């Protein structure tokens, strides 16, 4: 079951944290999250899953930044979120998708207990100008049934900003 917007609002401060929160971004069954002004781009065209891949910051100016096709941009939400007792999920807004902009390549699914900013895997079909603060995606919450454990991974939990892939740590186990 997906929580309604009113349920999301009722759970704020206990089971759900969205900071900063603004009522105008609440939808019937989701909440719009905004794009931070910083992006990361990988320094190399060839990436290696078993190694850390370096990335450089890119600031989105107020007049916007033209994104190139065939390039992955890592961004993040302005909003910090926490989810306790619900499964958070992230999707691009339909208006964003209709412009050919993907906000996540595969990672739209969160875990119960996740706390942090959402890293966005931004990819465009056509060159597109993006702006800081644009409502780029929406978070929604599923109920969970049965016994469960909260998210424990240290890789992305309590992040302070954009998180490049830490998959290489899985190979160190």
Swiss-Prot record:
Quaternary structure, from the entry: Homotrimer.
Family membership noted in the UniProt record: Belongs to the dCTP deaminase family.
Residues given in the record as dCTP binding sites: 93-98, 111, 119-121, 138, 151
Encoding gene (name): dcd
GO annotation, biological process: dUMP biosynthetic process; dUTP biosynthetic process; nucleobase-containing small molecule interconversion
Listed name of the protein: dCTP deaminase, dUMP-forming
Site (Important for bifunctional activity): 108-109
Gene source species: Cytophaga hutchinsonii (strain ATCC 33406 / DSM 1761 / CIP 103989 / NBRC 15051 / NCIMB 9469 / D465)
Entry keyword Nucleotide-binding: yes
One of the Pfam families matching this protein, by short name: DCD
Annotated keywords: Hydrolase, Nucleotide metabolism, Nucleotide-binding
Pathway(s) where this gene product acts: Pyrimidine metabolism; dUMP biosynthesis; dUMP from dCTP: step 1/1
Active site: 121
GO terms, molecular function: dCTP deaminase (dUMP-forming) activity; dCTP deaminase activity; nucleotide binding
Family matches, as InterPro entries: dCTP_deaminase, dUTPase-like_sf, dUTPase_trimeric
């Amino acid at each position: 079951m997906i929580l309604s917007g009113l349920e999301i609002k009722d759970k704020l401060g206990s089971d759900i944290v969205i900071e900063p929160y603004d009522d105008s971004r609440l939808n019937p069954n989701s909440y719009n999250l905004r794009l931070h002004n910083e992006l990361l781009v990988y320094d190399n065209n060839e990436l290696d899953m078993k190694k850390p891949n370096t990335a450089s910051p890119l600031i989105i100016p107020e007049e916007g930044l033209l994104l190139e096709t065939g390039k992955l941009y890592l961004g993040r939400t302005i909003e910090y979120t926490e989810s306790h007792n619900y499964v958070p999920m992230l999707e691009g807004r339909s208006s964003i998708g209709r412009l050919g902009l993907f906000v996540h390549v595969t990672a739209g699914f969160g875990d119960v207990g996740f706390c942090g900013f959402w890293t966005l895997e931004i990819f465009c079909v056509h060159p597109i100008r993006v702006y800081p603060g644009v409502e780029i995606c929406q978070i929604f919450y599923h109920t969970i049934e049965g016994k469960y454990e909260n998210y424990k991974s240290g890789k992305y939990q309590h992040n302070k900003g954009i998180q490049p892939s830490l998959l290489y740590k899985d190979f160190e186990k």
